[in-house]
């Protein structure tokens, strides 16, 4: 029976879930994850406790709860459940209040109340830009890009571009390197005037073949020898052109994005 882990929040729960994943990944154990977002009333807090207690009875062991509930009354209700409750706000906010000699607002969802802020507008603009400039769809306004990701097809360019846009408000375009580019031995002409904005992604050829086979099984596009050729050529081109690059093979999207921000020295515009 897998231990049950609850992610309880008065908002989306993204913060609590990210923290929970970081902690749980330290253990060689699988977990059953239950997300309980928008617990913004006492009624919902009591309902959450019922779910937690039912899981404890079913599993024959206490549940594990990661919580970011700001309301102290709701928090106290959840803490009475049959669970190990890991309260992120109590753990971090109270020591900060003491250190800063300043009371926190204890306002629910304050971290996400940004719909009218410049950060939110910047993020939406970045998302629209990244979608419009995905996979070399458009060369218009490439000069507005903060970064242009290059690499062979299925090397992780699209998810990384969108993550940079959604998480940090970075205008990230991405452009594929294709066999015709390797035959010419040159970057696509649309990219040459934006060389300082280029960042490359590569990937292990075997892993690339596996990913491409899911999309087009048995094709030349997915063949191991073709994948090796494309990766070798793309890495040679990036070295020749002086383009910074990394392998996405064993890295999460978060790690890739953070590395890119560090390498091109972009400020994180949103959080």
Swiss-Prot record:
Transferase found in the keyword field: yes
Species of the source: Burkholderia vietnamiensis (strain G4 / LMG 22486)
Function of the protein: Bifunctional serine/threonine kinase and phosphorylase involved in the regulation of the phosphoenolpyruvate synthase (PEPS) by catalyzing its phosphorylation/dephosphorylation.
InterPro entries xrefs: Kinase-pyrophosphorylase, PSRP
Family that this chain belongs to: Belongs to the pyruvate, phosphate/water dikinase regulatory protein family. PSRP subfamily.
Reactions that this protein is recorded to catalyse: [pyruvate, water dikinase] + ADP = [pyruvate, water dikinase]-phosphate + AMP + H(+); [pyruvate, water dikinase]-phosphate + phosphate + H(+) = [pyruvate, water dikinase] + diphosphate
Binding positions for ADP per the UniProt entry: 151-158
Pfam families associated with the record: Kinase-PPPase (PF03618)
UniProt GO MF annotations: ADP binding; ATP binding; phosphotransferase activity, phosphate group as acceptor; protein serine/threonine kinase activity
The name this protein goes by in its record: Putative phosphoenolpyruvate synthase regulatory protein
Sorted UniProt keywords: Kinase, Nucleotide-binding, Serine/threonine-protein kinase, Transferase
Coiled-coil regions, chain positions: none
Top-level lineage group: Bacteria
PANTHER family per record: PYRUVATE, PHOSPHATE DIKINASE REGULATORY PROTEIN 1, CHLOROPLASTIC
HAMAP family: PSRP
EC number(s) per entry: 2.7.11.33, 2.7.4.28
């Amino acid at each position: 029976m897998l231990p049950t882990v609850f992610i309880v929040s008065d908002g989306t729960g993204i913060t609590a879930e990210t923290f929970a994943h970081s902690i749980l990944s330290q253990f060689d154990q699988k977990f059953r994850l239950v997300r309980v977002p928008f617990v913004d009333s006492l009624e919902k807090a009591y309902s959450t406790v019922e779910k937690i207690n039912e899981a404890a009875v079913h599993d024959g062991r206490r549940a594990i709860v990661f919580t970011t509930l700001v309301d102290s009354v709701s928090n106290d209700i959840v803490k009475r459940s049959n669970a190990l409750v890991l309260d992120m706000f109590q753990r971090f906010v109270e020591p900060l209040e003491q250190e800063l000699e300043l009371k926190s607002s204890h306002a629910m969802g304050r971290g996400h109340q940004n719909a009218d802020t410049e950060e939110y507008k910047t993020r939406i603009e970045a998302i629209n830009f990244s979608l419009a400039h995905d996979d070399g769809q458009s060369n218009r306004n490439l000069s507005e890009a903060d970064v242009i990701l290059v690499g062979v097809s299925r090397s992780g360019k699209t998810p990384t571009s969108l993550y940079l846009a959604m998480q940090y408000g970075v205008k990230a375009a991405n452009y594929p390197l294709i066999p015709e580019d390797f035959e010419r031995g040159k970057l696509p002409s649309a990219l040459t005037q934006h060389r300082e904005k280029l960042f490359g992604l590569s990937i292990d050829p075997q892993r690339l073949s596996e990913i491409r086979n899911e999309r087009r099984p048995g094709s030349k596009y997915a063949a191991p020898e073709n994948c090796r050729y494309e990766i070798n050529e793309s890495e040679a081109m990036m070295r020749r052109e002086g383009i910074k690059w990394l392998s996405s093979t064993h890295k999460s999207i978060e790690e890739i994005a953070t590395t890119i921000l560090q390498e091109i020295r972009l400020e994180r515009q949103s959080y």
